[in-house]
Swiss-Prot record:
Protein name: Small ribosomal subunit protein uS2
Classification lineage: Bacteria, Pseudomonadati, Chlamydiota, Chlamydiia, Chlamydiales
PROSITE patterns the UniProt entry points to: RIBOSOMAL_S2_1 (PS00962), RIBOSOMAL_S2_2 (PS00963)
Region (Disordered): 244-273
Molecular function (Gene Ontology), one example: structural constituent of ribosome
GO-annotated biological processes: translation
Species: Chlamydia felis (strain Fe/C-56)
Signal sequence, renumbered to the chain: none
Matches recorded under PANTHER family: 30S RIBOSOMAL PROTEIN S2 PROKARYOTIC AND ORGANELLAR, SMALL RIBOSOMAL SUBUNIT PROTEIN US2M
Record's keyword annotation contains Transmembrane: no
Pfam family, one: Ribosomal_S2
HAMAP family linked to this entry: Ribosomal_uS2_B (MF_00291_B)
Protein keywords: Ribonucleoprotein, Ribosomal protein
GO CC annotations, alphabetized: cytosolic small ribosomal subunit
Entries under SUPFAM superfamilies matching the protein: Ribosomal protein S2
Length: 273
């Protein structure tokens, strides 16, 4: 086991508050294995097991990178979204930090159509704005912002992820269910109120504390970055536009769906909705 992948200590985890679980009345009995004790009405997580689980999981994370498969970070609750987005960008991986849209993994055709719509709107706003009225521009800008907010982190995802990393699988149960349906392994930060059964790599910890989430997600991100550096793999931001070669390949796949219409006709139906 490559313990060098993780330089954290039990003390680091404790200082981040990773040991604080939920109130005893809100626990999931299946998390009993990872609980150290009950104190003042709260369950205290066994941080030795947290560290063990993290060190056990990191080589599997690195294996996904070595297999040239993408990783998807998921964390849409307030405490997680900024951490998830920053870590994914720094690692050159993908993320969902806003609303999880049903079918993001299991119905990629629909998601790709939404991304194509986003691309078309951007093109019209940047290249064809002179043909649009102020009202049309305002409506398109509003729609663009909504689509970008939800799709930004997976916009250039072209392959099925080799791993999904989740903060709070109870909160992200749809994402977990879609990953399991496709046979994608799931690594999750799991608190004492969650069911760890569907999770392949359980990291027991306080998943409501910003410090706890940041500490553990940063350790995972660092392992990804260091593995890529050792392999000589370029770290490219997931929100960066595709290269010309990648764009050409993508265009070839989607060419049959491209059809130049009058701008008014393009968006009449969508705006009516």
């Amino acid at each position: 086991m490559e313990e060098s992948l993780c330089n954290l200590s039990v003390k680091d985890l404790m200082e981040a508050g990773a040991h604080f679980g939920h109130q005893t009345r809100r626990w999931n009995p299946k998390m009993k294995l990872y609980i150290f004790e009950e104190k003042n009405g709260l369950y205290i997580i066994n941080l030795a097991k947290t560290l063990y689980q993290l060190r056990k999981a990191l080589p599997q994370v690195c294996k996904v990178i070595k297999e040239n498969k993408p990783i998807l970070f998921v964390g849409t609750k307030k405490q997680a979204k900024c951490v998830i987005k920053e870590a994914a960008i720094e690692a050159g991986e993908y993320f969902v930090a806003e609303r999880w849209l049903g079918g993001m993994l299991t119905n990629m055709t629909t998601i790709r159509n939404s991304i194509k719509t986003l691309d078309k709107i951007e093109k019209d706003l940047t290249q064809n704005s002179s043909y649009l009225t102020k009202k049309e521009i305002a409506l398109l800008a509003k729609r663009h912002q909504k689509l970008l907010k939800n799709l930004e982190g997976i916009r250039y995802l072209r392959k099925t992820p080799g791993l999904v990393i989740v903060v709070d699988p109870g909160y992200e149960k749809i994402a977990v269910a879609e990953a399991k349906k496709l046979g994608i392994p799931v690594l999750a930060l799991v608190d004492t109120n969650c069911d760890p059964t569907p999770i392949d790599h359980v990291i027991p910890c306080n998943d409501d504390s910003l410090k706890s989430i940041r500490l553990i997600i940063s350790a995972i991100k660092d392992a990804i970055v260091n593995t890529k550096k050792k392999l000589g793999v370029e770290i490219v931001s997931p929100i960066k536009a595709l290269t010309s070669d990648e764009e050409a390949n993508s265009s070839a796949e989607e060419n049959e769906n491209r059809q130049e219409d009058l701008l008014a006709k393009k968006y009449d139906s969508s705006e009516a909705n």
